[in-house]
């Protein structure tokens, strides 16, 4: 008899829209897919940057089991020491020792579920613009894999470019259970089970504002940035909402992914879709 574990992985939670669409839909999704575990990237949960203690607890109450992060992990300074040390939260692993917060939290964790040792790892790509140094994610993950201390290994690769994520997949196909790209907030159309049995997608997408936003932010600010080089704090758009994620099932005996499916829910507000931004150019 096959022993399998079913997972839901949700992309970057961005602001109030992302929090609420998860709260309103996660229980139904867990029931639909009979999911055993839910993993969420929460690096943009609090006003678009970082994760506060209040919103960490919000996600847990909504039914999230484990949380991954990204380049905005350290933005919510007030709650940082508490949140980053939560046993079910994984911040980026490949931090250089010169980074002030490199010794806070964990970049990878191992837990047991259904007689399987499961590892979750969070890594930053070399293509993400950062104000601090990181170590090479390829070399860091290889070193971790060589420990051979888990049955399943779920990797959240928080990176900017499609080429780096594709290269990551080619390098680690069959050596980890999943390689899920995060960070760009736009879901890619390449979800697949690789020839060696890993699940891969270049970017899962986000749980946040809908199509009336620019990857979650107000369009006006993004247009001014690209047209005039305007540098301002991006505000989270109030237009509708979208939820993007991946369902996947793993055969514990073979350690291979046997099923994947993209998850997408869109709840757009037509008022924002009809806005005219032409005169901003």
Swiss-Prot record:
Q: What is its EC number?
A: 3.1.-.-
> Active site at which residues?
72 (proton donor)
Required co-factor(s) are:
Fe(3+)
Q: Which UniProt keywords apply?
A: Hydrolase, Iron, Metal-binding
UniProt protein name: Putative phosphatase/phosphodiesterase MPN_349
The record's similarity note reads: Belongs to the YmdB-like family.
Locate the residues binding Fe cation 2.
43, 71, 158, 183
UniProt binding sites for Fe cation 1 = 12, 43-44, 185
Q: What species was this sequence derived from?
A: Mycoplasma pneumoniae (strain ATCC 29342 / M129 / Subtype 1) (Mycoplasmoides pneumoniae)
Highest taxon of the lineage? Bacteria
Q: Name one GO molecular function term.
A: 2',3'-cyclic-nucleotide 3'-phosphodiesterase activity
> Has UniProt tagged this entry with the keyword Hydrolase?
yes
